[in-house]
Regions:
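N-terminal loops that bind phosphate or other acidic moieties
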Residues: 2-336
Length: 336
């Protein structure tokens, strides 16, 4: 999937040459919505989701025959700062749980009809502690970007993205603060269970890290403050865009992962929707900054791609109505 993408350097990553939404397909889908046996607009966001899918798949009546779910896992050097109550070994243990079908994401993908792949990214080699220096070198960042891009199935009709990594809610807060601004306290949350003192400590760590890397810009923010799973998510988003595959991002950590793409060029994320609004306090602020309205609000904060998998059911329902309902003319119903 990397053939049409330039991963020679972070500075070379550009939206130039990437496909745009098919306006004709959107118009055709909208016309079909107007002809279906219902009052105009009565299916609310389901109609908009059908048009979104039509525009990116390039057809007035898109289908989801193949849904791919990718969960990227990585470990973070900033855990040396004591920002998480769990040891980093949990990342590998959860990867094994995913692979054996025992996690929430396994059950939710089964219900939603998504093929799940878990990609572990050098778990034995955490990134650098970003309070002391950059989390990753440019070469490490580009390698993870490529891993993410190469994991995308070009025959998929939709892509779900999730993550696993002890400490990555702190990484997400740092990325959010660096790209969108504000104060660290408004970006950090409990993550996997930090208490009030732990949250305050996370805020201090994030403040220190973002100050240290204040000169980082564009995709350089990803190298300075991100992790391998965040870079892989960005790579997958870019590869999906090249293949016109719509993307459902999960919650706070996934959305923060792509914040450097938005900071580089907001158009990078035109083919992405956010599956759910996380309970993490920074997520609402981040979605507003990125111009994304989450599909669901379920008071979740698990990660793994769980909220994105739930949102896939909504997307399937939107297309079932869009493609399966009769038009007024077909049904012989007056008013069309």
């Amino acid at each position: 999937m990397t053939s049409s993408l330039n991963f020679d350097s972070l500075a070379a990553i550009s939206s130039a040459g990437l496909p745009a939404i098919d306006a004709k397909a959107v118009a055709a889908a909208r016309a079909r919505q107007g002809a279906l046996t219902k009052p105009p607009g009565s299916l609310g966001r389901l109609e908009a989701l059908a048009e979104f899918m039509a525009g990116w798949r390039g057809t007035a009546q898109p289908k989801i025959d193949k849904a791919q779910a990718l969960v990227f896992a990585g470990n973070h050097g900033v855990c040396a700062q004591g920002i998480n109550p769990f040891p980093q070994e949990v990342t590998a243990q959860m990867v094994a749980n995913f692979q054996h079908g025992g996690a929430a994401i396994n059950q939710l993908c089964a219900v939603a009809g998504a093929d799940l792949t878990v990609v572990a990214l050098d778990l034995e080699r955490p990134t650098g502690d970003f309070t002391q220096g950059p989390a990753m070198s440019e070469a490490e960042t580009l390698s993870a970007l490529r891993r993410g891009a190469e994991a995308v199935d070009p025959s998929a009709d939709v892509l779900i993205l999730g993550e696993m990594g002890i400490g990555n809610s702190t990484v997400a807060a740092a990325l959010g603060l660096a790209v969108c601004g504000g104060e660290a306290a408004s970006w950090v949350g409990a993550g996997t269970g930090a208490d009030a003192a732990g949250i305050a400590h996370k805020a201090d760590v994030v403040t220190k890290a973002v100050s240290l890397h204040r000169d980082a810009t564009g995709m350089g923010v990803l190298a300075a403050l991100g992790g391998r799973e965040q870079a892989a998510i960005c790579g997958a988003v870019l590869a999906a865009r090249a293949a016109r595959i719509p993307v459902i991002l999960d919650g706070f950590i996934c959305t923060a992962a792509v914040a450097p793409l938005h900071g580089t060029d907001p158009a990078f994320l035109d083919h992405c929707i956010v599956g759910h609004a996380s309970r993490e306090p920074g997520h609402t602020r981040l979605c507003e900054a990125l111009g994304k309205d989450p599909v669901l609000r379920m008071d979740m904060a698990l990660g793994e791609g769980s909220g994105a998998a739930l949102a896939l059911n909504i997307l399937r329902s939107a297309l079932a109505c869009h493609n399966g309902m009769a038009t007024f003319a077909e049904a012989g119903v007056a008013g069309g």
